[in-house]
Amino acid sequence: MNLMITLLTNFTLATLLVTIAFWLPQLNVYSEKTSPYECGFDPMGSARLPFSMKFFLVAITFLLFDLEIALLLPLPWASQTTNLNTMLTMALLLIFLLAVSLAYEWTQKGLEWTE
């Protein structure tokens, strides 16, 4: 019974918050809200600068490699397990996967954002 009350309360609260977040921004839309703000001055240039998609892809690739390397951080604690062969196999497999992924990105020129 307590589980049902908790689930119903959470669902109701989430639905209420999503509804409020959906309808609230549409109440007061005027031109000053949609214009860029630079410390009270008129904008010197366009606030919508072009963004390099190649740089974005390099940044995402870096983030993925960084997260994969973070998987190696618990290895010193994992080395104290009784089954050392499994731990070493998984660690070497992860390092091999990182090396192959880096080689693939390098050969496909995915790490260069200048042309």
Curated annotation (Swiss-Prot):
An example of a Pfam family matching this protein is: Oxidored_q4
Membrane topology annotation: Multi-pass membrane protein
**Single Gene Ontology BP term?**
mitochondrial electron transport, NADH to ubiquinone
Superkingdom to which the source organism belongs: Eukaryota
Q: Does the keyword Lyase apply?
A: no
Catalytic reaction(s) noted: a ubiquinone + NADH + 5 H(+)(in) = a ubiquinol + NAD(+) + 4 H(+)(out)
**Enzyme class per UniProt:** translocase
Q: Which GO terms describe its cellular component?
A: mitochondrial inner membrane; respiratory chain complex I
What EC number(s) does this enzyme carry? 7.1.1.2
* Annotated compartments: Mitochondrion inner membrane
Regarding protein family, the annotation reads:
Belongs to the complex I subunit 3 family.
Q: What does this protein do?
A: Core subunit of the mitochondrial membrane respiratory chain NADH dehydrogenase (Complex I) which catalyzes electron transfer from NADH through the respiratory chain, using ubiquinone as an electron acceptor. Essential for the catalytic activity of complex I.
Q: What does the subunit comment say?
A: Core subunit of respiratory chain NADH dehydrogenase (Complex I) which is composed of 45 different subunits. Interacts with TMEM186. Interacts with TMEM242.
- The name this protein goes by in its record: NADH-ubiquinone oxidoreductase chain 3
